[in-house]
Amino acid sequence: MQKQYLNNISLNTSQDRNEQISQWLEIVFPNNVPKFEAASADASFRRFFRLTFSDNSTKILMDAPPDKENCQPFILVSDLLLKADILSPQIFQIDLQNGFLVLSDLGKIGLMLALNLQEDNYEKSLLMHPVLEILLKLQKSSKAGILPPYDAKMLRRELNLFPEWFLQKHLNFALSDKETQDLNAVFELLIQNAVQQPKVFVHRDFMPRNIMLSESDDLNPAVIDFQDAVYGPITYDLVSLFRDAFLSWDEEIELDFVIRFWEKAKNQNLPVRKDFGFFWKEYELMGLQRHLKVLGIFCRLNYRDHKENYIKDLPRFIRYAMKTSHRYSELRNLYALLLKINEKHFHLDVAEIINSGSKFQNLDFDSYMEYV
């Protein structure tokens, strides 16, 4: 079914947004006006509603207020996923003027839910293998010049959220001149690590919460929340998947998956590094960039956008950042800063954090084989 563009639908702007949705549905579906109920919301201003029609069929309405959200990137990336044969919501109707998209309904079973229902690591692993295949498909479909570049300017803007929103706003923590200089040096290291990597399509939030198990397609994994996709570092989506905002993996399991991905990527002629130790370090430093950024983003969501659910996950990112910064001598100043922050604000068990991954320091492929 081709996408239908809807134009010149005038809504009563004096109504609240839910009343506008009701009015819009009556105009678009005059012979079968669906009921609508909240399906989900995300960290942006977008909301999603499940539309239920008289025959009990369902669709999803994306509500993206045009003064706050731009639907065009979602439409562009949706087309890229379709061409790459990656399952994602199909777009039926588009109303850019009012900020509404009608999408296919993938169901209610997310990968995050499915993982949490499995107690056995082997069963969890079985759920992850098809997701790696999706990531490989996405990267193999990459072409320069289509998506925005994930360049040094964007990376630096993201990293600056860490001192602005996490250190200053959340912790009321004032950096000394030397700490500011040291942090900027770390930022430059992380930026160079990212921009020097081979470039592919990057979902930019490729994590279990953004993978659905499609109820209309034999529970095959489908990708959602892809509108922020860019062209950037090959390790970004991989580390987003296994060093997640809401789920932590034992490092032995994580490492096994990273090696599996690396081997498959090499075999499929993706531009990964030939040396796994080099690839692993790129992966870890890319993860650190993401985690410092997310510490800032979660605080901004709390203080600016009044979304309080994210703040409770800050300790997970402190753990990630401490473990990585402890491993590499060039990150020792960041590690010292994180120790200072932890001692004053978080009181996490530092020895437990460090020892949980100590056997993987300075890792190469051959040494990994001792642990599997």
Language-model features: where?
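Conserved NTP-binding catalytic cores of kinases and kinase-like/nucleotidyltransferase enzymes
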Residues: 1-100, 200, 214-220, 339-372
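An alpha-helical support segment within catalytic cores of ATP-dependent transferases
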Residues: 21, 26-27, 143-148, 158-201, ...
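Active-site acidic catalytic loop and adjacent metal/ATP-binding pocket
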Residues: 45-52, 61, 138, 188-238, ...
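ATP-binding pocket architecture of kinase catalytic cores
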Residues: 49-155, 161, 167, 171, ...
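Secondary-structure capping and boundary motifs in well-ordered enzyme cores
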Residues: 127, 203, 227-234, 280-288
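Active-site activation/catalytic loop segments of kinase-like enzymes and analogous catalytic loops
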Residues: 163-170, 234-271, 285-305, 317-325
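Histidine/acidic-rich helix-loop-helix segments that form or flank divalent-metal centers
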Residues: 272-281
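ATP/Mg2+ or Mg2+-diphosphate-binding catalytic cores
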Residues: 296-372
